[in-house]
């Protein structure tokens, strides 16, 4: 038999572990590891490759992991975890198979190499299946693993029985994920010796502690030389400076929009996927980021932490307070380039500019009607759904929009002046065109005397409305009454026999 050009050794087919990784394995997993490694060793010997030292066999037989030295531990640690989501990933598999293929090219008549390659693939696949990390659907994964293990445990074509057919399957939930193991190892290797004297929080590096202490002192040592804005930490300044340079390295693959931060890209991508992981526990409404949920919860709690120092009005968001304060200062920094109109908020400018461009980006899926603002679309869609979420607390009537409800509530706020026989005065209520109600008091009137209202209703055409009055035909000097008749289109104005107020409705000049 012709020897291969390159010798295949046991460490080429071994799955290496660090001590911390080995401690995470259950006894059944360690047993399967030992059997797989011994099987690989047997395949090497049967294929004619150089065998390992007896020390290796002794360690495997005692159930200890095959570890070369500290340098190998570091190399294996970085390679095994290269593929996220797999606890045990044998990245040397292709290299080993390539060596086996080279050996087979030199030994075309020898069948042991084919068996060795097949068994190696079989052992690697069996062990790799048990190295999968836990997914969100652990029950489905376990079922899938059991099926794959059963198929992998079928005897090979040469009639040999698989040594793992009767072994208890691995439970993937016993294994940890890459991030958990890395965090565990990092914590053990690096001591957090730098402790904050204010809150007791510990840090690995002194510079991290210094940045943290700035939060307590309020100091912002990292200042932008372009706009003067200061930051607690240097990386915050670096991200801020990208804004001045126009550098947005994170691009959305769906729409091409770019972002300063990766976190901003992650949040934006949820607008494409429709994912809303932050759910309100009160009403069930979902949000794409936690900050929006925090602001929304203030609607339920009534909390308004941002208060205007000028008028005391409260707001749920700081941006709303800043926009409100511009009313007091008179500043309107956002100017429309078309008509020169100034607005206090940037979003207000964007909406206003759509009136010039005719853009209506929010389209109804039912009838195709477009709207400038999303709230307009939401209210419009309630026409199709029949939803009327705003209910009047006075009469129970429901409305599609809050603004319509507010107008309706004004009808309940109109005060009716009831008659009062005890009152020494009479009231005349004048309803103006602009719907403002004016109440005017008149001195008490003697019975059987006409009401002189020419001064009150001069130059106006009026119609007498209200409760019926007792007709009274005046006697004596009727010159004043004649003037009143002319003013009131020949309608007799008399003093009511019971009530002492008269309601006049102004119909025009």
UniProtKB/Swiss-Prot annotation:
Keyword list, A-Z: DNA-binding, Metal-binding, Nucleus, Repeat, Repressor, Transcription, Transcription regulation, Zinc, Zinc-finger
GO terms of biological process kind: regulation of transcription by RNA polymerase II
Chief subcellular location: nucleus
Single GO term (MF): DNA-binding transcription factor activity
Function statement: Transcriptional repressor. Binds to a specific sequence, 5'-GGGxxxCAGxxxTTT-3', within GADD45 intron 3.
Similarity comment: Belongs to the krueppel C2H2-type zinc-finger protein family.
Protein name: Zinc finger protein 350
């Amino acid at each position: 038999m012709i020897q291969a050009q390159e010798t295949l050794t046991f460490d080429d087919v071994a799955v290496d572990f660090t001590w911390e990784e080995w401690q995470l394995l259950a006894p059944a997993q360690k047993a399967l590891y030992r059997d797989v490694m011994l099987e690989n060793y047997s395949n090497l010997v049967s294929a004619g490759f150089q065998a390992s030292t007896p020390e290796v066999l002794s360690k495997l037989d005692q159930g200890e992991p095959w570890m070369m030295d500290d340098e190998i531990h570091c190399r294996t640690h970085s390679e095994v975890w290269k593929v996220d989501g797999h606890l045990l990933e044998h990245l040397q598999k292709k290299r080993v198979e390539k060596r086996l293929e080279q050996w087979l090219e030199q030994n075309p008549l020898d069948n042991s190499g084919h068996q060795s390659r097949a068994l190696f693939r079989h052992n690697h696949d069996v062990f790799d299946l048990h190295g999968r990390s836990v997914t969100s659907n652990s029950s489905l994964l376990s079922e899938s693993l059991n099926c794959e293990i059963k198929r992998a445990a079928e005897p090979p074509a040469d009639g040999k029985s698989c040594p793992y057919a009767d072994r208890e399957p691995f439970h993937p939930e016993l294994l940890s994920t890459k991030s958990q193991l890395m965090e565990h190892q990092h914590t053990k290797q690096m001591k957090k010796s730098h402790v904050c004297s204010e809150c007791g929080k510990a840090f690995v590096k002194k510079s991290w502690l210094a940045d943290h202490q700035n939060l307590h002192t309020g100091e912002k040592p990292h200042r932008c030389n372009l706009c003067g804005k200061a930051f607690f930490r240097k990386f915050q300044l670096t991200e801020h400076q990208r804004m001045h340079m126009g550098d947005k390295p994170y691009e959305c693959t769906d729409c091409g929009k770019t972002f300063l931060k990766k976190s901003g890209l992650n949040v934006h991508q949820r607008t494409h996927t429709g994912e809303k992981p932050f759910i309100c526990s009160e009403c069930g409404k979902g949000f794409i980021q936690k900050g929006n949920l925090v602001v929304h919860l203030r609607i339920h709690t009534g909390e308004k932490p941002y208060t205007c120092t000028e008028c005391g009005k409260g707001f749920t968001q700081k941006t709303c307070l800043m926009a409100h304060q511009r009313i007091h200062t008179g500043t309107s920094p956002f100017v429309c380039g078309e008509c020169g109109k100034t607005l206090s908020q940037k979003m207000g400018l964007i909406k206003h500019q759509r009136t010039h461009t005719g853009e209506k980006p929010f389209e109804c899926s039912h009838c195709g009607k477009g709207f400038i603002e999303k709230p307009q679309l939401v209210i419009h869609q309630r026409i199709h759904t029949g939803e009327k979420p705003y209910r009047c607390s006075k009469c129970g009537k429901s409305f599609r929009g809050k603004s319509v409800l507010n107008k309706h509530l004004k009808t309940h706020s109109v005060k009716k002046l009831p008659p009062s026989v005890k009152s020494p005065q009479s009231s005349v209520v004048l309803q103006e065109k602009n719907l403002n109600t004016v109440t005017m008091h008149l001195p008490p009137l003697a019975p059987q005397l006409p009401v002189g209202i020419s001064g009150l209703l001069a130059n106006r055409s009026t119609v007498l409305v209200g409760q019926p009055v007792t007709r009274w035909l005046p006697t004596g000097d009727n010159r004043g009454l004649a003037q009143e008749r002319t003013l009131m289109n020949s309608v007799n104005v008399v003093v009511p026999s019971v009530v002492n107020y008269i309601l006049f409705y102004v119909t025009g000049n």
